[in-house]
């Protein structure tokens, strides 16, 4: 199966999961990225079961609205039973690197409110040690050079994310992203805390302190479920 076929497989599995596990009338948490987009497409078939959705990005909000979902502001919501999102890498503990799509801060906020985080990914995303995928760090623009120096002191090689047109990439929050390569992440929780404490960092794309509760992994043999 191709990577796209595996993504579609886990997206449908996640739609089946929320149909079974999320009570009618509840609010659904929705992530960002190519796999999350396929989940939105799949879950739209029974969108009327839900009171609405909280989205982690402007892009996901647009896609949800195109399908007729009511998109709610997180400040209006007290409870999100399940948040569904992809990952750039995930390890055996359920810790993840996220933020390749630039929505790491809002993803982390919505995930922190959710009762369960369901990660959907193809088999290539499950790794023994994270760090091959560059670690995104969202940074206040005025602090980008200072943060880059401190991240380099931790052993990383930070690079400012750029748009295809050569301009500096900006998040939905108006900040910049440093993509940090060269890290072998053997202590995800410790590194998440260390980077988050650097002044000027909004958040790092390590989801270890609040990792996944369920992994739906697309493989050639079908969808494998892991509970953490």
UniProtKB/Swiss-Prot annotation:
Gene Ontology cellular component annotations, sorted alphabetically: cytosol
GO BP terms, alphabetized: D-ribose metabolic process; pentose-phosphate shunt, non-oxidative branch
Gene3D superfamilies: 3.30.70.260, 3.40.50.1360
Pathway: Carbohydrate degradation; pentose phosphate pathway; D-ribose 5-phosphate from D-ribulose 5-phosphate (non-oxidative stage): step 1/1
Keywords in alphabetical order: Isomerase
Assembly and oligomerization: Homodimer.
Family indicated by similarity: Belongs to the ribose 5-phosphate isomerase family.
Protein name: Ribose-5-phosphate isomerase A
Organism from which the protein derives: Cupriavidus pinatubonensis (strain JMP 134 / LMG 1197)
Lineage per the UniProt record: Bacteria, Pseudomonadati, Pseudomonadota, Betaproteobacteria, Burkholderiales
